[in-house]
Swiss-Prot record:
NAD(+) binds at residues 76-89, 282-294. Keywords: Amino-acid biosynthesis, Branched-chain amino acid biosynthesis, Cytoplasm, Leucine biosynthesis, Magnesium, Manganese, Metal-binding, NAD, Oxidoreductase. SMART domains: Iso_dh (SM01329). Homodimer. This is 3-isopropylmalate dehydrogenase. It comes from Pseudomonas fluorescens (strain ATCC BAA-477 / NRRL B-23932 / Pf-5). Its EC number is 1.1.1.85. One of its GO terms (cellular component) is cytosol. Pathway: Amino-acid biosynthesis; L-leucine biosynthesis; L-leucine from 3-methyl-2-oxobutanoate: step 3/4.
Length: 360
């Protein structure tokens, strides 16, 4: 029986980078007889333009029916002034919540070929391989009540809510421990337990879960210190588990240790490892349509999809090896270019990965 993959290119550079990822996926599909069937739909600003909402009900139904979703990026200045509840980003939040995608895996890996592209000295980041496990459907991004009210003195005051239940914390903690168990057996839980009640519960529950993983070394770190340590000595970390907002911020910080956020894929998984896969970067509307965006994060998201949702290790490894070979050839998009390398565009980079994969 064929497996259904829903393709959601999104906005900005999304369609450009997705076109290259789809080429790689289609080749892998043929080369390894994966049995995938691909279908396409719209999300974000593209969905607003077509349906008037950032995620149409029929698109959500197709996502539920699919075995995995591959997404580009959403958002752009075109939709910045519309009502907040129907902005492109709300479509992304909704599909995550409705599909139960509570576990976000964001690797930060420095390819040896890109050591000079990192913002830190090579000796600080050489060999970097961190996995950030971010809780994705709870916390302040979804908490209620939220809003803006007028105080007695006429001044406006805005407020948000940061709730976490024991079950929400427990399930993401288990993802963190499971990932640490198959990696370096070190897990750092990041919170703000010296200030936030939600973080105090977070730390308590993580400690409880740790009893089931005696082979994994658990440490705790306040988020402000973690942000500093990621720059000071990033290789002390193996797996980091943290809440929605902290994970959002720390994973973007970690991305720049690798040279470019354009290199980093991500996976968002439900309890059964059904997932949505997307690059960590945004829609980059400032370069959309210019053919210069880096498609490698989206291509590597395909690899993550094969690995985590379908357990297709051989095909996943091959795509990652193809990307590494292209970097060995000195091909670079502008965001990772350095002297002595060859600058290429989006399509050229995608074609190079396809050629490398075909020749493996």
């Amino acid at each position: 029986m064929s497996k259904q993959i829903l393709i959601l290119p999104g906005d900005g550079i999304g369609p450009e980078i997705m076109a290259e990822a789809v080429k790689v996926l289609e080749l892998a599909n043929d080369k390894y007889s994966l049995g995938f069937e691909l279908s396409h739909d719209v999300i974000g600003g593209a969905a607003i333009d077509k349906h008037g909402v950032p995620l149409a009900d029929e698109t959500l139904d197709r996502a539920r029916a699919a075995d995995a979703v591959l997404l580009g990026a959403v958002g752009g200045p075109k939709w910045d002034k519309i009502e907040r509840d129907i902005r492109p980003e709300r479509g992304l939040l909704k599909i995550r919540a409705q599909l139960g995608l509570f576990g976000n895996l964001r690797p930060a890996i420095l390819y040896p070929q890109l050591a000079d592209a990192s913002s830190l000295k090579p000796e600080i980041v050489s060999g970097l391989d961190i996995l950030i496990v971010r809780e994705l459907t709870g916390g302040i991004y979804f908490g209620a009540p939220r809003g803006t009210r007028e105080l007695e003195n006429g001044e406006r005051q805005s407020y948000d809510t940061l709730p976490y239940s024991e079950s929400e914390i427990r399930r993401i903690a288990r993802v963190g421990f499971d990932m640490a168990r198959v990696r370096g057996k070190k897990l750092c839980s990041v919170d703000k337990a010296n200030v936030l009640a939600s973080s105090q519960l977070w730390r308590e529950v993580v400690e409880q879960v740790a009893k089931d993983y005696p082979d994994v070394e658990l440490s705790h770190m306040y988020v402000d210190n973690a942000a500093m340590q990621l720059v000071r000595a990033p290789k002390q970390f193996d797996v980091i588990v943290t809440d929605n907002m902290f994970g959002d911020i720390l994973s973007d910080e970690a991305s720049m240790l690798t040279g470019s956020i354009g290199m980093l894929p991500s996976a968002s998984l439900d309890a059964n490892n059904k997932g949505m896969y997307e690059p960590c970067h945004g829609s980059a509307p400032d370069i959309a349509g210019q053919g210069i965006a880096n498609p490698l994060a989206t291509i590597l998201s395909v690899s993550m999809m094969l690995r985590y949702s379908f357990n297709l290790t051989e095909a996943a490894d091959a795509i990652e090896q193809a990307v590494s070979r292209v970097l060995d050839q000195g091909l670079r998009t502008g965001d990772i270019w350095s002297a002595g390398c060859t600058k290429v565009g989006t399509q050229e980079m995608g074609d190079a990965v396809v050629a490398a994969l075909r020749n493996l």
